[in-house]
Amino acid sequence: MSIVKYMLENNTVFNVPLSHLQKHLTEKEKNIFERFLDENILLRKDLTPERKGPFSRNEVVNFTYDSFRDYLISTYLLDVVEPNNYLKLEALAKEYTAKGHQLREGLAPFLFVHARNSQNNKVINMISCLDWYADVFEMFIWDIDDVLITQDDIALVKSILASDQPGYMANKLIL
């Protein structure tokens, strides 16, 4: 079972039990995985923070970089969850990008860019109704392949640029 699948099924983005991940690996894969974890490049081993005592702590795995975790979650949602269960994707996307959720800031841009670049109109229509869409659009439309930019995108960019908010260009687009 993948680390991302575990996170989604257990509604946690931290502290995946190392023992849980290892039980799905062959001995050769375990050796490679252990060496990979020892380097702390993309994943790292930690001790469970909530358990006390020298013999009660278990090793857990966390992502070294939250943005890499968020990228993998967005990819898993759009490439694995959505084709099999659109309603589940919709519920998770809304939950994970709701105001105050710890994934919102990192996950929303990846959902936007991946949905747009993969031309997933069903997902694009769904996320375009979410409260974060306009802000993410302004910041990340530039990451979309030029051939995928629509006339609606151009019109929205023009309206943003023509807005009469003082300092908008400097604050939002340049800085």
Name each model-derived stretch:
Residues 12, 57-59, 75-175:
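Extended amphipathic alpha-helical scaffold segments
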Residues 1-80:
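Extended helical regulatory/linker subdomains that flank P-loop NTPase cores
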